[in-house]
């Protein structure tokens, strides 16, 4: 059924949550609740999933880059993300999620399954598995991340970097592959970041000093080349109803596994048991804190 006729509105009104008023026109509270999720987009989603209409749509707060909703059909709940910036943020996220899922042990770590991706007139829509989050300890989260790093490291392409242009937040992540960690870290991450600041304090001489300092610090470092989440702060991780770790909103690349551990130290960090379980798989090396 095309989501453009009055019977569709009536049918939804009869079955959606009572908290949502019955729609009378397309400017009713029901569609205000959809926050610019257009009827054309809803119709495209339904056709992609082989569904006739959503049972309910509820806006989800928390992100500052995308709009998001929980969308429920008769037999499933999905998380819908929508972006209008025309920069392929969600296409990159889809790619990262699909690649990370190849290396997880599902007994300990969950990564949302990608259900569908659509680009409708430069508006991106990503549908992924909805996961109810709970407050458990972080043992399985730490163990699951360690297992992901270990399995990906065992089958990695022997190159550092990533084959597609990416993002961390709204910041571009340069694509490319290097055969060693120092060149990757400098050429694909540090130098592009410094150049993007366009500040006089980062002139050519200063950038060269930064390069030499990083080279000297990493010269004797022997990294584990793993597929990392890439943006693993506490807001992008949690636990499901079974106590399994959950990670989402990735900015993946092939990198030193310590990239993820360093990121977990931001904004309050993770719990003690997370690090204990992770370091059972990857023991702490000299210089980790540095």
Model-derived regions: residue spans:
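Alpha-helix boundary/capping motif
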Residues: 2-7, 12, 21, 25-28
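ATP-binding pocket architecture of kinase catalytic cores
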Residues: 58-183
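Short, Lys/Arg-enriched N-terminal segments with co-localized hydrophobic residues
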Residues: 29-33
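Short acidic/polar mixed-charge low-complexity motifs
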Residues: 51, 74-78, 244
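An alpha-helical support segment within catalytic cores of ATP-dependent transferases
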Residues: 38-49, 153-228, 240, 280
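Active-site Asp-x-Gly
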Residues: 177, 181-186, 195, 224-227, ...
């Amino acid at each position: 059924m095309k989501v453009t006729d009055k019977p569709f509105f009536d049918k939804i009104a009869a079955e959606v949550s009572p908290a949502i008023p019955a729609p009378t026109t397309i400017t009713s509270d029901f569609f205000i609740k959809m926050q610019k999720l257009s009827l054309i987009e809803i119709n495209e989603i339904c056709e992609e999933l082989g569904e006739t209409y959503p049972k309910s749509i509820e806006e989800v707060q928390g992100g500052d880059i995308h709009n998001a909703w929980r969308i429920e059909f008769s037999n499933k709940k999905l998380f819908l993300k929508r972006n209008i910036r025309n920069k392929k943020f969600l296409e990159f996220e889809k790619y990262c999620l699909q690649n990370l899922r190849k290396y997880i042990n599902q007994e300990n770590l969950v990564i949302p399954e990608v259900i569908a991706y659509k680009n409708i007139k430069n508006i991106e829509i990503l549908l992924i598995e909805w996961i109810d989050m709970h407050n458990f300890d972080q043992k399985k989260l730490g163990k699951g991340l360690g297992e992901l790093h270990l399995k990906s490291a065992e089958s990695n392409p022997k190159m550092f970097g990533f084959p597609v242009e990416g993002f961390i937040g709204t910041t571009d992540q340069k694509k490319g592959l290097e055969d060693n960690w120092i060149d990757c870290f400098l050429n694909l991450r540090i130098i592009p970041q410094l150049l993007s600041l366009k500040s006089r304090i980062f002139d050519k001489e200063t950038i060269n000093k930064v390069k030499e300092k990083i080279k000297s610090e990493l010269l004797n470092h022997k990294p584990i080349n793993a597929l990392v989440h890439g943006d693993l702060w506490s807001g992008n991780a949690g636990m499901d109803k079974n106590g399994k770790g959950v990670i989402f909103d990735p900015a993946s690349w092939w990198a030193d596994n310590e990239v993820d551990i360093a990121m977990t130290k931001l904004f309050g960090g993770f719990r003690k048991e997370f690090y204990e379980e992770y370091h059972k798989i990857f023991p702490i090396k000299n210089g980790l804190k540095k």
